[in-house]
Amino acid sequence: MSYPESKLTGLTGFALAAKVTGGWAGPVVSITNLDQLKANIGTVTPQVLVINSNISASSLTKVNMGANKTLIGSFQNRTLENIHLRATAQSQNIILQNLIFKHSANIKANDDIQVYLNYGSKYWIDHCSFVGHSWSTTDGSEDKLLYIGEKADYATISNCFFGSHKYGLIFGHPADDNNAAFNGYPRLTLCHNRFDNMEVRAPGLMRYGYFHVYNNYINKFHLGFTLAQNANILSESNYFGEGSQNNGMLDDKGSGTFTDTNSVPPITNQKSPKAQWTATSNYAYTLKTAAQAKDFTQKNAGAQAAALVFGS
């Protein structure tokens, strides 16, 4: 059984600021079936859970997570199909790495999301692939690939691939109801990710939280950022490819704050005022140019069959 043993190498962003450790303080456990996954990931004991056989369910199957876990895909087998990971009230300090998330096209309701984090803090999602499926604008689907919101906090999504899906990612309390209880949640970093063939929400629909989004490559899209209720977004050196000719990089509802620097092409249709915070007040990081980010993510984003390469 071979798997990435880089541990906390490449940890960056708000997950770094929160000192995420996952389960690396505990033993390594080989996971080969759904029952083993459920039995181990739901506890709070530190463990490194290595997916050593692809795990598939014929219908949507929710798996509740505990705390202090590293769930990591082996270099040989690393696919979770129709397995939906859900946070619980005890969830915190979790690393998801080198995993392939697949789901059937008929699992498409609004809340059908394979990674759903609405509790806890200290999450690192790294080198994962959310591979989607064929879609059309009229297929009736409402599902998304990933959600981090409500009171979930201090998270980083890095070096991941998101592709072939009508809706992409959604962050923050999922309503435009100006609910002050959710202001500031989540604090989230998105960096060195590749988004391809998605209609909207790549890199995401963002509400309420603080979002640092840098060095991502978004290609074949209709709308990129959707800035909604009370979101505070810092965008740096992101590369928008096919689809940018329609100026859909930013869908700004005018109800948050937004600052972009050095993205390609420049974002010019901002309605909201500029953001009043800086990422460097929370953690240090190194920027690539937008062109360098495009090249890096095409080569290195997503789950891998050999050693992981990190953008930070």
Curated annotation (Swiss-Prot):
Residues forming the catalytic site: R201
Keyword match Lyase: yes
Polar residues biased stretches: 256-274
Stretch list, region Disordered: 254-274
Keywords: Lyase
EC identifiers of the protein: 4.2.2.10
Cross-referenced Pfam families: Pectate_lyase_4
Swiss-Prot/TrEMBL induction comment: By DNA-damaging agents such as mitomycin C.
MF terms (GO), sorted A to Z: pectate lyase activity; pectin lyase activity
Source species, domain of life: Bacteria
Keyword Nucleotide-binding: no
Reaction catalysis annotation: Eliminative cleavage of (1->4)-alpha-D-galacturonan methyl ester to give oligosaccharides with 4-deoxy-6-O-methyl-alpha-D-galact-4-enuronosyl groups at their non-reducing ends
Family: Belongs to the polysaccharide lyase 1 family.
The name this protein goes by in its record: Pectin lyase
Organism, as annotated: Pseudomonas marginalis
Gene expressing this chain: pnl
